Structure formats: C-alpha cells, structure tokens
C-alpha cells in the first residue's frame, strides 16, 4: 500500500501509483514514467522509487 501523501511535502501521490506500477512492469524506464506523470519533486519521486509492497508478506500474521 503506497502512502496517500508524500511524507515531505504532502502532495497526494497515491492516485499515480497504479499507472506507475503498470508501466514500469511493462518495461518502461521508471524516471521517464515519473516525468510523464508529472512527478517532478525529488521527495515525491523517492516515495515511488523506494516503495516496497509488504502487504502480502504481512497479511498471514493478522
């Protein structure tokens, strides 16, 4: 689960996650996808580049 807002600046970023993930999975360059989506701030870009999906790992321990 991607955070709804950037931790640093507060910009809403979660609405871009599905498009970003789909395009990167299809083989596009992550930097080019972020540029195309209009994610230009370094703080917001790091939210996408450093995100790791842990929900599937943690869900068995509920």
Curated annotation (Swiss-Prot):
Tell me if Disulfide bond is a UniProt keyword of this record: no
Catalytic reactions of this protein: RNA(n) + a ribonucleoside 5'-triphosphate = RNA(n+1) + diphosphate
Give GO cellular component annotations, separated by semicolons. Answer: cytoplasm; DNA-directed RNA polymerase complex
Q: EC annotation?
A: 2.7.7.6
- At the top of the EC hierarchy, this enzyme's class is transferase
Localization, per the record, is: Cytoplasm
What the record notes about the co-factor is: Binds 1 zinc ion.
Q: Which cofactors does this gene product need?
A: Zn(2+)
Query: Could you state a single Gene Ontology molecular function term?
Result: DNA binding
Keywords annotated in UniProt: Cytoplasm, DNA-directed RNA polymerase, Metal-binding, Nucleotidyltransferase, Transcription, Transferase, Zinc
Q: What is its main location?
A: cytoplasm
Q: Which domain of life is it from?
A: Archaea
Q: Which GO terms describe its biological process?
A: DNA-templated transcription
User: Which residues take part in binding Zn(2+)?
Assistant: 6, 9, 43-44
The answer on whether this UniProt entry bears the keyword Metal-binding reads yes
Similarity section: Belongs to the archaeal Rpo10/eukaryotic RPB10 RNA polymerase subunit family.
Name the NCBIfam families for this protein: PRK04016.1 (NF003089)
- Function according to Swiss-Prot or TrEMBL: DNA-dependent RNA polymerase (RNAP) catalyzes the transcription of DNA into RNA using the four ribonucleoside triphosphates as substrates.
Quaternary structure, per UniProt, is: Part of the RNA polymerase complex.
Protein name, UniProt field = DNA-directed RNA polymerase subunit Rpo10
Q: What is the source species?
A: Methanosarcina mazei (strain ATCC BAA-159 / DSM 3647 / Goe1 / Go1 / JCM 11833 / OCM 88) (Methanosarcina frisia)
């Amino acid at each position: 689960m991607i955070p709804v807002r950037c931790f640093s600046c507060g910009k809403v970023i979660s609405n871009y996650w599905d498009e970003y993930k789909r395009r990167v999975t299809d083989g596009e360059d992550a930097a080019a996808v972020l540029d195309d989506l209009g994610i230009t701030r370094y703080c917001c870009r790091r939210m996408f580049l450093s995100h790791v999906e842990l929900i599937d790992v943690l869900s068995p321990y509920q």
